[in-house]
Amino acid sequence: MEMQSYYAKLLGELNEQRKRDFFCDCSIIVEGRIFKAHRNILFANSGYFRALLIHYIQDSGRHSTASLDIVTSDAFSIILDFLYSGKLDLCGENVIEVMSAASYLQMNDVVNFCKTYIRSSLDICRKMEKEAAVAAAVAAAAAAAAAAAAAAAHQVDSESPSSGREGTSCGTKSLVSSPAEGEKSVECLRESPCGDCGDCHPLELVVRDSLGGGSADSNLSTPPKRIEPKVEFDADEVEVDVGEQLQQYAAPLNLAHVEEALPSGQAVDLAYSNYHVKQFLEALLRNSAAPSKDDADHHFSRSLEGRPEGAGVAMSSMMDVQADWYGEDSGDVLVVPIKLHKCPFCPYTAKQKGILKRHIRSHTGERPYPCETCGKRFTRQEHLRSHALSVHRSNRPIICKGCRRTFTSHLSQGLRRFGLCDSCTCVTDTPDDDDDLMPINLSLVEASSESQEKSDTDNDWPIYVESGEENDPAGDDSDDKPQIQPNLSDRETLT
């Protein structure tokens, strides 16, 4: 069996110990104020303190002190009271500070509770404002109806008996129309925060006036339809008000019906300065009978032909709305938005996937292009090409250091940097006895060739032939071999 009162009693005892500073082994400094607490309570409820106290597990005897710079002292005091009592003291003034402090201390339960509190508070305020607006609208409608009734009665009393019937009919019409106007004002207050009906529905008023100026047959056959702007509903109020909205509002009138209902030569006076009208135009373009952009432009040009010259601002606003819907216009061609490829490591974006792949190599360190001669790797192929042309000089002939011959193509990897051809790296001495083969010491060859290089004007090694003429192989052999043989004989006598 569980005792529900045990938890509250245990928390109460711990809170009493904290207030009396009994067995408190932790201190938190916030904005100069010192708060005493127990490590176990902080460790069990806060992820921030859990990560902070994990370093002091072995040093259980030491007194821990933490300093918080981001959290306010009032918010931390409320959170600390919640840890020891389970009660969170929230109000409209401190809920934001408490929620930010709980988020910093990694207390998800407190954050979710604050969000719920904010949502419920906003719902209550919204309902109160809505009820007040409806009550004010009903009172205004009742006052208008009473004033209209008084005016009608006064008109009936002042007129002659012969025209009394006409006055009575007119008064009846005014009485019938005044409640409709009251309902209209109530709907305007519900739909938008502004109370001016003229700013909320400019299209509706103009269409009604134009339809009222037509023939009586058209008024009887085609009743005026209402144009309602796009209204953004709150997610919590949609389920409650959707039935009422569907019953009260008629179907929205598209642009083609407006043009058919208007008489020829009369233009629609559009007020584009209102934000709700812009939303309505976006919805109108989305649901219009014109299937393409050209048809929509044709409809708008027809409806705006009779506008005065002083309506330049309204025209510019219309083009802004149209550009937002269709995208950028370049003459008669519609420019399709370009898809940008985003780097997963930084904010860099590229128009082509290959460019982004090359950019990602700067983050990963990948170098997929190695040099065949020296083994150095590069991120781009053109860098490898320039490296091969500038460093290894593959197109220039090189004079061998041993035999003084020029060589370009008959090379193995890495021999170009030593300046020796293949024949000089494999030179051997062939005495009378073919069975005993002694390899040539290349260090002696280099020592003998150094004396010849000192007399040369060019001291760079390896030596490159700039003129492109190759030396005579026969002449080089006749000059160099007699010098190599004495050195070898001296070496043999020394050993």
Curated annotation (Swiss-Prot):
One of its GO terms (cellular component) is chromatin. Keywords: DNA-binding, Metal-binding, Nucleus, Repeat, Transcription, Transcription regulation, Zinc, Zinc-finger. Residues 158-177 have a biased composition (Polar residues). A zinc finger (C2H2-type) spans 341-363, 369-392. GO terms for molecular function: DNA binding; DNA-binding transcription factor activity, RNA polymerase II-specific; zinc ion binding. Its main location: nucleus. The keyword DNA-binding applies. It comes from the Eukaryota. It is found in: Nucleus. Residues 24-92 form the BTB domain. Changing E181K: In a colorectal cancer sample; somatic mutation. Residues 467-479 have a biased composition (Acidic residues). Residues 157-178, 446-495 are annotated as: Disordered. One of its GO terms (biological process) is regulation of transcription by RNA polymerase II. May be involved in transcriptional regulation. PANTHER family: AGAP004733-PA, ZGC:110075 PROTEIN. This is Zinc finger and BTB domain-containing protein 8B. The gene is ZBTB8B.
